[in-house]
Design a protein with these regions (language model features):
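An alpha-helical interface "stripe"
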Residues: 1-215
């Protein structure tokens, strides 16, 4: 959804989705629009609206899932998961991040004896998914373009797993054609000059009007 007024019926569908994630699936939920505070201790830990990854949650997950890794290795893994290369396309970013999420992030460091150590840092626990990961759904997340900072968009519902935006949900009022959500909104968001960084880690795109859904 672009940064304009929110139709009350659109908001009803959005609130219903968020309530289901919270009450039925155990997700944490946050309503961010005009309520988010920024900084390390802010609502989501973001420094500003160009950040699509919640680095505070990513760092916490890396530490939790890789207790044997020293801080420099954790820092390297976090950088690898948030690197934005303007010479690469959205698809290239997505493919690379998918490999890192699935296979682990290669890291190396020197131990106390000066010996090189190599490992792969996990950012998601696929074996104990429910208990070992943090699931957070954010409503009305404001995003600003990286190459063009004057492009501002407001995402209806973004679902984060350990701080990574894996699911992007565009919601419409029940009487609206869900195709419009893809053609009129998602295509715009994914433009390299708009907020493509929000889709670098994406696994699912969902459009729904509360009655029907496509992904």
């Amino acid at each position: 959804m672009a940064a304009t007024g929110i139709n009350s019926e659109d908001r009803l569908v959005q609130a219903t989705f968020a309530a289901h994630l919270k009450d039925k699936l155990g997700w944490d939920t946050v309503y961010a629009f005009n309520a988010e505070t920024f900084g390390a201790d802010g609502t989501l830990g973001r420094n500003d609206t160009t950040e699509a990854v919640l680095t505070r949650d990513v760092r916490a997950a890396l530490r939790r899932l890789n207790p044997e890794l020293p801080t420099p290795a954790i820092d390297d893994a976090l950088r690898a998961l948030t690197l934005h290369d303007f010479s690469r396309s959205l698809l290239q970013h997505n493919q690379e991040f998918a490999r890192l999420i699935r296979n682990g992030i290669p890291v190396s460091w020197r131990d106390a004896n000066g010996q090189r150590r190599d490992a792969r840092a996990r950012v998601i626990d696929f074996d104990n998914a429910r208990d070992a990961n943090r699931f957070l759904a954010v409503r009305e997340l404001k995003l600003t373009g990286l190459p063009t900072p004057n492009y501002n968009r407001r995402a209806d519902l973004v679902c984060f797993v350990n701080g990574l935006p894996l699911v992007f949900i565009e919601l419409k009022a029940v009487y609206k054609n869900i195709r419009a959500g893809f053609d009129g909104n998602l295509r715009d968001y994914m433009d390299e000059n708009v907020v493509a960084q929000a889709f670098h880690h994406n696994v699912f795109l969902i459009v729904s009007n509360g009655d029907r859904a496509k992904y």
